[in-house]
Amino acid sequence: MAKKYFGTDGVRGEVGQFPITPDFVLKLGYAAGQVLVQHDTDQKPTVLIGKDTRISGYMLEAALVAGFTAAGVNVIQTGPLPTPGVAYLTRALRLSAGVMISASHNAYSDNGIKFFAEGGVKLSDEIELEIEAKIDEEMKTQPSARLGRARRISGADDRYIEFCKSTFPTHSDLRGLKLVVDAANGAAYSVAPKVFHELGAQVVSIGDEPDGYNINEKCGATHTKTLQAAVLQNEADYGIALDGDGDRLMMVDKNGKVYDGDSLIYVIAKARAREGINIGGVVGTVMTNMAMEIALKEQGVDFCRAKVGDRYVLEQLNQRSWLIGGEASGHILCMDKHNTGDGIISALQVLAALQTLNQDLATVCADWQPYPQTMINVRIQKGQKWQEASKDVLAEVEKELEGKGRVVLRASGTEPVVRVMVEARQADWARDGAERIASAIGSL
């Protein structure tokens, strides 16, 4: 059954527009609370609510609290905390569920609601459908004796900081390193600099002055120019860029070069292989560069592809019992350290890997150079049989590129567009293949 409200990462949209309105979020909290009560019959469920720094977080938090408590669910509020911190505390405090109020890397005018089940794992499709089924039902507040309580806890930041530090090798520290940390004026603005400082690094903080409106604004993992300039200006060894909710990572070296999620995953995997740690393999996505796949296999590391989205990477990791995965966008999963993507922990794993390899980031990543890619968006008509139109040309291009390139065709889920991506060892091969396929699709 198709979901009505939940997307691939919870419920998200523009604040003030359905579904990110206080009345809908009230119903969402109530519906989720009802499902929790049904599944947790032995005691009154307790849910943890965290948020990023968007101005709308106050409004949406209040609506969620009202909905949960009306359903008879207790609520613990942490205030601003990264998404992976909410997942960790949900698990560490043995709570029934966790909720993060954030729209990740989007502008302040958007917001969203993301749920975690018991243990800090993402909700299953089945539970999301259960919640959706109850949203449109009439709200029936519990009798006063059964209403939930809400309270704020202190020390959530400190618990999460200690957890992050515990993922770094106990025999090592970061003394001697100068780091610029860009927290995107988001959920990690307070905790991220402290983690690296307490491990011994000299830290220069930027993107650490949220005002409710400046989250992700010309800063963070989706806008690294500010960080690149700060690294050069401060003569730092590395720059660390997080996104608004703290689950993505990009890094910058001392020369101002940016390293995306694919490069950082390679560094971590190579170091684990060097240490003889069995990670099983690495899960990327259909968009992961083929050159990285080849480089990993040269290190003796297996590789497979999932659909785009950290949710699907996580599914493959769990199915295969592998430990490392992620996307070029900076979602990196180290399953032996945390059960969700975590920008701070991922950065610590990269820095630990560089110590293991006794090399800097540029040297390790020189092992492979991304194959050139050509991407073309082709507009189509509703109901157009573009697969049939491109079948013969697609087969030709794939045969020509066998072993030295690949093709990805993806229909957009939000607009009438087919995305054609061809990558190959040589840029002209990629360009020629993409143009031929795009012409075949658009010729109808």
From Swiss-Prot:
PTM description: Activated by phosphorylation.
CDD domains xrefs: GlmM
The enzyme's E.C. designation: 5.4.2.10
Catalytic activity line of the entry: alpha-D-glucosamine 1-phosphate = D-glucosamine 6-phosphate
Cofactor note: Binds 1 Mg(2+) ion per subunit.
GO BP terms: carbohydrate metabolic process; peptidoglycan biosynthetic process; UDP-N-acetylglucosamine biosynthetic process
Residue pairs linked by disulfide bridges in the UniProt entry: none
Active-site residues (renumbered): S104
Protein residues bound to Mg(2+): S104, D243, D245, D247
Gene Ontology CC: one annotated term: cytosol
Gene Ontology MF term list: magnesium ion binding; phosphoglucosamine mutase activity; phosphomannomutase activity
Record function comment: Catalyzes the conversion of glucosamine-6-phosphate to glucosamine-1-phosphate.
Family: Belongs to the phosphohexose mutase family.
NCBIfam families the record matches: glmM, PRK10887.1
Protein name: Phosphoglucosamine mutase
Organism whose genome encodes this protein: Neisseria meningitidis serogroup C (strain 053442)
Source taxonomy: Bacteria, Pseudomonadati, Pseudomonadota, Betaproteobacteria, Neisseriales
